[in-house]
Amino acid sequence: MSESKPRRPAYARLLDRAVRILGVRDHSEQELRRKLAAPVIGKNGPEAIDATEEDYDRVIAWCYEHSYLDDTRFVTRFIASRSRKGYGPARIRQELNQKGIARDATEQAMRECDIDWGELARDQAVRKYGEPLPSEFSEKVKIQRFLLYRGYLMEDIQAIWRNFTD
């Protein structure tokens, strides 16, 4: 006769899942809540955890209390990661907003980060269009559109030609 193990309480299962999720990389609270609420793929297919809203709140509080969840650390690392991938401040702000980070926390982290956005914009333009950067109007417009899409501010884009005319 096969004896099945009794199911662990929903809180314990949620807590295990939260620690596993946060062990891979930092998440915002909103991201963690979304991932915890998603069904778990088990041996018998997708399976929802029958947890209450109080269970989710307790897990989130535990994660904050034990420093598994830290929005300041998440924002700082996210800005560094996205800037290394060549994205500008406007795009990064928008992505952080989508992840549920408060605007004031985002702005404070953007002020504290040590990134020269003008230099980063120039590096992205050179990587895409080569050195020296084209000086024809139509090519400048292409570069401008590309950098705006990547999230750079117009003043940083215009500074490329103003400061690096060589």
From Swiss-Prot:
Compartment list? Cytoplasm
User: Under the cellular component aspect of Gene Ontology, which terms does the record hold?
Assistant: cytoplasm
Transmembrane stretches in the record are none
**A Pfam family reported for this protein in Swiss-Prot or TrEMBL:** RecX_HTH2
Its main localization is cytoplasm
Keyword annotations from UniProtKB, A to Z: Cytoplasm
Gene Ontology biological-process annotations = regulation of DNA repair
What protein family does this chain belong to?
Belongs to the RecX family.
What NCBIfam families has UniProt attached to this entry? Answer: PRK00117.1-1
Per the entry, what this protein does is: Modulates RecA activity.
What name is this protein filed under? Regulatory protein RecX
